[in-house]
């Protein structure tokens, strides 16, 4: 698991520059193929909302709003309840396992809130201009 933000710390190491960035992780060996071990988790943001990836699991907190942005026919990830997906078995995120896997959901919520805080649902409404 890697993220484009990890390029900052990784390229900095490559050119021997010291940078201080709490979001970026130095994963140069992963990017150049010397290692397959990247991040264990990642907070993901889209449309002003955040979700949490940990290993094969994706947790999307409840957010208000329409599940589909009709003007452009884009799925927004909004739901009244938590969503939990095993991406190894369900890459399309069709089978919400939140009710079937309450311990896993609780673990991901806890780890997400350690990074993001518990005010994650205070988001702006997306506006097309």
Tell me the role of every PLM-derived stretch.
Residues 90:
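Intrinsically disordered, low-complexity polar regions and short flexible loop motifs
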Residues 26, 104-107:
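Exposed alpha-helical structural elements
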Residues 107-129:
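Charge-dense polyanion-binding interfaces
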Residues 84-86, 98, 109:
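A generic structural signal for ordered secondary structure
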Residues 95-103:
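Active-site-proximal N-terminal segment of extracellular/periplasmic enzymes that hydrolyze or transfer
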Residues 10, 93-96:
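A general alpha-helix detector
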Residues 3-83, 87, 119-124:
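C-terminal cap/loop subdomain of S1 sulfatases and analogous C-terminal strand-loop tails that border
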Residues 13, 33, 100, 110-114:
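Residues within well-ordered alpha-helical secondary structure of globular protein domains
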């Amino acid at each position: 698991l890697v993220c484009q933000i990890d390029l900052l710390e990784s390229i900095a190491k490559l050119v021997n520059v010291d940078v201080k960035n709490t979001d970026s992780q130095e994963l140069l060996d992963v990017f150049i193929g010397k290692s397959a071990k990247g991040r264990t988790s990642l907070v993901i943001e889209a449309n002003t909302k955040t979700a949490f990836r940990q290993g094969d699991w994706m947790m999307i907190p409840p957010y208000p709003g329409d599940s589909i942005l009709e003007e452009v026919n884009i799925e927004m990830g909004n739901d009244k309840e938590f969503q939990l997906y095993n991406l190894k078995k369900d890459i399309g995120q069709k089978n919400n396992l939140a009710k079937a896997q309450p311990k896993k959901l609780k673990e991901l919520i806890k780890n997400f809130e350690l990074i993001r805080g518990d005010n994650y649902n205070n988001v702006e409404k997306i506006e097309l201009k």
